[in-house]
Amino acid sequence: MKKYLIFGFALFLVCFISQNCRKQPGRDSYSSVLAEFKNPASEFRSAPLWVWNDRITREKIETQLADFKAHGIGGVFIHPRPGLITPYLSEEWLDLCRYAVDKGKSLEMKVWLYDENSYPSGFAGGHVPAEMPDAAGKGLQMTKKGKLQLPLDSSPFLVLRKTASGFEDITQQARTQSFPEGEFYIFELKQGNPSPWYGGFTYVDLMRREVTEKFLDVTLNAYKKAIGDEFGATVPGVFQDEPNILPVGGENTINFTPLLFDKFKAKWGYDLRLNLPSLFEEIGDWMAVRHNFYATLLDLFIGNWAKPYYDYCTKNKLAFTGHYWEHEWPIPRLSPDNMAMAAYAHMPGIDCLMNDWSQGPHAQFGNTRAVKEIRSAASQMGQLRTMSETYGAGGWDMTFFDQKRIGDWEFVLGVNFLNQHLSYVTIKGARKRDHPLSFSYHEPWWQAYRLL
């Protein structure tokens, strides 16, 4: 037994040495790696979400970037957020971004883009629905009745009547005649109400390619004109935040997009319309219908959002990172499969919010599955880096001990790029209650932060 153990250990050493002796430009020796640990390059340091939530000025940019540099920060993500006064994506905004990139370059820091005015990604601070009114997200709401009387309460999208063998479409008849008895399933299209959060508009349908193309044009092409010469250099990439396909309408509502029924029929060979009740009740071949429905949504979300976004970034030398709507599982109506979406990222990412340990399916810190999913996706797709947006809403009382235990837990599971949530330009007024803490001069421990 002893000689087998010795042989096994010797084999391990041979493999370890052979792996670590593979030359990498500039990092091909133990001494150079050790030196880099002592003083990491900017790409191996953390980069917080730098919250622009005030009237932004060159003086504020210069002062805070220098402060970040002095405290060991390697870069920032320019993150517009509530409280912002400088008009988003205006010429003034883009000029300030240019100044931040130039100043970051002079400090040997990275200046990443964040693709939205707050979140979730996709509506471009209201510019997308303003320029494309039909981009608004929708939902299909079901109401069940025992009779139908004229006039109908609304103009339904679809009316089904239950029969002995399934369901029949009586939409046209229901608009001109009453049905005194039976089982009727009425489906209505719902659209969200305008909201200040979405710039006075509504969220958009990310299962439509033309919506994504409008978003990329309005957002990333604007940045490309202003700072595109630094794409892939001082500006390494772009962060998407919580894009999702949540249906509008609340209770008894399913996802809807104009291509849904045609895509479903082409993929599965039968008409989803006549099987919609199976998405609400355990009737018919409901398990197969639900699987096929959510698989279709996933195809639409990947094909019309994730892939074109990823392709744009690849073409323009940007690393596509960020994350989808949290990592609760399973909630397919929000994001059918986070791991499948992560395949279309140059740096797959997650959210790890708050400061409470939990291992449940809806957990943040403690959700091992979420971290291992992105590490696995990165490994399978040949990507080296994985990102975590960490510490958000941890509270003003979060300690260094808390920060280290959360960070260490993520690192040991495979995260290798830490994105702190958040670093505020200002905390005046209500801003101080926007998911604190802040990795900035506002914290009493900031002077010691470089040690951590």
Predicted regions and their residues:
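An acidic-aromatic substrate-binding cleft motif
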Residues: 30-49, 191, 204-214, 222, ...
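Hydrophobic alpha-helical membrane-insertion signals
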Residues: 51, 154-166, 219-222, 230, ...
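Positively charged n-region of N-terminal signal peptides that target proteins for export
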Residues: 1-4
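Acidic/aromatic-lined carbohydrate-recognition and catalytic surfaces
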Residues: 79-213, 217
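Bacterial N-terminal signal peptides
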Residues: 8-15
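Carbohydrate-binding surfaces of carbohydrate-active enzymes
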Residues: 44-47, 57-62, 75-76, 81, ...
